[in-house]
Swiss-Prot record:
Protein name (database record): Protein DDI1 homolog 1
General function of this protein: Probable aspartic protease. Seems to act as a proteasomal shuttle which links the proteasome and replication fork proteins like RTF2. Required, with DDI2, for cellular survival following replication stress. Together or redudantly with DDI2, removes RTF2 from stalled forks to allow cell cycle progression after replication stress and maintains genome integrity.
Protein's UniProt keywords contain Cell division: no
Family, similarity comment: Belongs to the DDI1 family.
Disulphide bridges, residue numbers: none
Enzyme class, broadest EC rank: hydrolase
Length: 396
């Protein structure tokens, strides 16, 4: 009889091949044939047929109900690693039920190994007590707090668990940890069910397709983080120093904006609100919408030593004081030179540097007030302090 084998390796790569065997062919011999085709050692393989794991190596394939034209699933067992502090590092990659976070895909095999071990223990009737080895939330918590590297990874990749960890409440941390482990085990069971489902079931195939698509997205993100990590950083916007009516301003240079705009408060501060022509009122549309109060047809803007003519559309509410749009940039033949980090006024040849992040207005700064790093560092220090105090009390 001809059997089709759908192979899923430990690294989630897939392969499909066919084998011609007799119904009285024993399972352990079938595993050897699969090893020749897939390259996976026979002792690391599991065969699933009709959502059932074939475990008796000395039974014939026919005794399991296999017949000509059937498909079986070949799964590679997870690597059994020694129980070590790496378990705590694996927790840093545990993501909740939502989309995967950057850098988590590389640790998925280890996570599945943990869930498989947990399931096998429950299936054999072994009870994992709250204080048993690294399954103890208290021990996991202390290990994470004692490793700044793992703690920083946890805050980046699993914020909810990190928040529970830094709260100093062991019960809250245990609850979040167990909930995430339970969700991960359910997802793993669903994955195995889909792989062993009827290959002609449209719903199952759609779910498998979605899982493959999500895996491709995670792999693409992992490659991007490794090869081009700078693409995940935030970029400071382009601002320059200028003056309007002698009032110093920080203007946002935006070549994607059609017109130059100024907010109402800034227009009042620069004493040009009296020149607003309200016949030009309207609505500015972009990412959102803003009400245009009117237009100042002619004003003077000073950039370095140059005094340039400019017109402004006055917006009722706008976080930035002023935005230099394409109308003004084209009129004065301005060019944005990112290599030298300057704005060049083409009509005069004057250059003005773009502002560094520290000089940007509050609305444009990437971090305002106490940065998240500083805040999280304080939380970490407090959590470690409480942990040390608790351990000291237990010793006494």
């Amino acid at each position: 009889m001809l059997l089709t084998v759908y192979c899923v390796r430990r690294d989630l790569s897939e392969a499909t091949f066919s084998l011609q065997v007799r119904p009285d062919f024993e399972l352990h011999n079938f595993l050897v044939l699969c090893e020749l085709e897939s390259g996976i050692p026979a002792e690391e393989t599991q065969i699933v047929y009709m959502e059932r794991l074939l475990v008796n190596d000395h039974c014939s394939l026919g005794s399991y109900g296999l017949k000509d034209g059937d498909m079986v699933i070949l799964l590679q067992k997870e690597a059994m690693r020694p129980r070590s502090p790496e378990r705590a590092a694996g927790l840093c990659s545990m993501e909740p039920a939502g989309p995967a976070l950057p850098g988590t895909s590389g640790s998925r095999p280890h996570q599945r190994a943990q869930s498989a071990q947990h399931s096998s223990r429950r299936g054999s009737g072994e009870k994992a007590g709250p204080g048993q080895g690294l399954d103890s939330p208290a021990l996991v918590r202390s290990m994470l707090l004692s490793s700044p590297h793992d703690l920083s990874l946890l805050k980046e990749r699993n914020p909810s668990l990190a928040e529970a960890l830094l709260s100093g409440n062991l019960e809250s941390f245990s609850q979040v940890l167990m909930e995430q482990q339970r969700e991960r085990a359910l997802r793993e069971q669903e994955r195995l069910r889909l792989f062993s489902a009827d290959p002609f079931d449209l719903e199952a195939q759609a779910k498998i397709e979605e899982e493959i698509r999500q895996q491709n997205i995670e792999e693409n993100m992992s490659i991007a983080m490794e090869e081009a990590p700078e693409s995940f950083g935030q970029v400071a916007m382009l601002y320059i120093n200028c003056r309007v009516n002698g009032h110093p301003l920080k203007a946002f240079v935006d070549s994607g904006a059609q017109m130059t705009i100024m907010n109402q408060v800034c227009a009042e501060r620069c004493n040009i609100i009296r020149l607003v022509d309200r016949r030009w009122a309207g609505v500015a549309k972009g990412v959102g919408t803003q009400r245009i109060l009117g237009r100042v047809h002619l004003a003077q803007i000073q950039i370095e030593g140059d005094f340039l003519q400019c017109s402004f559309s006055i917006l009722e509410e706008q976080p930035m004081d002023m935005l230099l749009g394409l109308d003004m940039l084209r009129r004065h033949q301005c060019s944005i030179d990112l290599k030298r980090n300057v704005l060049v006024i083409g009509t005069t040849g004057t250059q003005t540097s773009f502002l560094p992040e520290g000089e940007l207005p509050p609305c444009a700064k990437l971090v305002s007030g106490m940065g998240p790093e500083e805040s999280s560092d304080k939380e970490t220090a407090n959590a470690i302090k409480h942990s040390v105090m608790d351990s000291g009390r237990k010793k006494h």
